[in-house]
Amino acid sequence: MNNNNNNNNNNNNNNNNNNNNNSNNNDNNYKNNSNNSNNKNNNNNNNNDDNNSSNNNNNNNNNNNNNNNNSNNNNNNNNNNSNNNNNNNDKNDSTNNNLSNISNLNNKFNFNNNDDIIDSECDNNYESYNNNNNNNNNNKNNNNNINDDNRPLVPKILNIHNCIVHSNSNSSNSLIEQSSFPGTPKKRRFIDYLDDENEEDIDYNEENYHSIKNHNHHHHIHNYNHNYNQHSINDDNNRHIHNNNNNNNNNNNNNNNNNINNHNNMNDRIDHNDCTLVNNLTPRDDQNYLKNNSNLEFVNKNNQANNIFNNNNNNNNNNNNNFYNNPFLNQIPSLPFSSLSDNNGDDDDDGIDDGIDDGIDDGIDDIDQEFTYNNYEQYDKEIDSDFDSEISNSFHQNQSPCNNSFKNNNNNNNNNNNNNNNNNNNNNNNNNNNNNNNNSNNGSTSTSSSPCIFSSSFSPSRATISPNRFKKSYKSLNRPLKKFYEETSLSQSSTTTISTSTTISEVFNEKSYSFSSFGSNSFSSLNIKNLNNNNNNNNNNNNNNNNNNNNNNNNNNNNNSNNNNNNNNSNNKNNKGKVCFLNKEIEISLAQEPNDEQNKTKKELEEVKEEEEEEEEEISTIESEKNKDIMMDFYHNTLSKFSEFKIYDQDEPELLEFENNNENNNNNDQDYHYHSFINGRVNRQSNNDLDRFNTQTFNRYNRSINPMALLLEKQGGDDPEDSSDSDSDSDSNSNSDSSDLGNITVRKWKPVEITNSTTTDESNVIKVFKNNKNINQ
């Protein structure tokens, strides 16, 4: 509906990527039909009654143009910009396109070539910047741009002490030039005026009211391009030219020349009385904003409004397409941006202003009546049971028949606004055949008697709406999708049979609605022809289409070539566990694999049974032996985790020798030497020294430090003072009823439970049993 303003010129001029046609035409940038009289009927995508849609008409006039309205240049990276003078094939320097946009700014606003230059020094810097950017790809086109008749002009802004002109690109070739205005007192910097947010400190020339006021920190002179269709500023969430990094081979310069791209997205605007569709991140009461701005600012409210209707996570650079083609905004009439010239066909500047004024005024009046900012809030509310009727009532109004142009409009314009200007055009070099074949076959595969289910315009994103509402939004579509499933007889697939009770939402649960395979899921005309295109549209997720830039012709043409017969025969190889939808293989989670046990012989089943019995016997054996050698288990599993310990049997107080425990040769000091078992080895160490675990000697008085002291709880015995002289008699007492442990005489020990201090799980409780005679065995 709104995308062909620029593509008409591209269709005429870019078959061979000869961008001079655009660069040398002052009127060609914004006069819709100045060079293309054959494409006047393509200005409104929704009014085309041809089954092949308006996109097919574009292909009839342009053999080398892709039938995506946003990307009609076969090899032109800047699909939407007829103003791009540097669209060399497959050149990825996005800075080359800034020059043409500044040129368009001159053409649009009629800057005076002699009076509106701020300063010759600054102007020279700007030309140097343009030359630097264009030398990367096309010096010839650059020379055609910078000439006496059509050179980019910098808007006049007075009292600016530094002229900073550089590209919005991440290109290493961007040139930043600064020059001082001679004779101007450098009282304050330009950024100081802007930080005060006092418009009066900056003297804007009234004659040049169309000056671009950029309040970014770096104060780029942004590239204003008239051919941004709906005259809206694209707030791109700080992506601007960088956002096409995912499509460097396809559309690197595409999105950035359609709009004014903001660095910080807070205060950029165009003070132009013809441009009412100003998009800002936050509502503003500033008088410089137009009166109707508050009703339209939801278009770019952090891109959330667009994300509700489009899976728009990375490359949402054509917000006006989302806005005017959205089924929820269907009450908005078609604004006459596609015919900006006078009725008499004269391509003068007055026609543009009149067309914009009339179209926007009429459109805004209807918007005020039918659609306000509250509609965005209304969608943000909890989705109730009337959600089905909301879609059905709002979807078909003001739309052309779904089986004709609207279906392809979904394919090529709105399927996945991650690449608005590059829908169905992952590969500018290859998608010519891909899209042409697809659209030529769509007419014959459409079911004219079946209604549309839903459009790709309605594709809520998980990233922007709550999971509850996302689930309900597709759950509400379950009923029509079930009908759609039954009517298309997908259950009779030659590869896999699915019960008719299975709904499409269940089949596509993991693939489609996660936006990981199908992009934005357009199910129009009761066939799944659009699935081929959707896979090509999602450049962010579908690695197959993004990486195989040279193979899309083979992939998609093979699929689309059989759409006329709808016979599912071309891709039936190796379709086990898949459902073939119009020759497009789609993996589904419901496909049941053959039961392996059905193919096993009786002998194999017996062997399996025997193995299971053996395992059960082993388990029972372990259970029967679990109480044996419990002290050894206790030692290996628990005591070995402590640095120092001694274990006495309850009835036999002699020291149990787990290792080669020789006599306490060092037990001569008052400091009490003892054997410590560290990781299964004997370590003779004095208490004065810190062992490698930095623990203290355990006894009944330091149990808070060492939990092993719990083992040494005695039921009776002498106090430590009474056995102070028994340090050297440890060996002689080995066969008595008492034993020496440091300064403590122990006669009897009671069994205790060692419990893991961090949990109370019974599995972590180890019981110490008495009279375990097999502890050393």
UniProtKB/Swiss-Prot annotation:
Amino acid composition bias (Acidic residues), ranges on this chain: 344-366, 607-620, 718-730
Ranges of compositional bias, category Polar residues: 334-343, 391-407
Domain of life: Eukaryota
Feature: compositional bias, Basic and acidic residues: 597-606
Extent of Low complexity compositional bias: 128-147, 243-265, 408-466, 532-574, 731-740
Region (Disordered): 1-101, 128-150, 219-267, 334-366, 391-466, 529-577, 590-622, 713-751
Protein name: Putative uncharacterized protein DDB_G0287457
Source organism (scientific name): Dictyostelium discoideum (Social amoeba)
Record lineage: Eukaryota, Amoebozoa, Evosea, Eumycetozoa, Dictyostelia
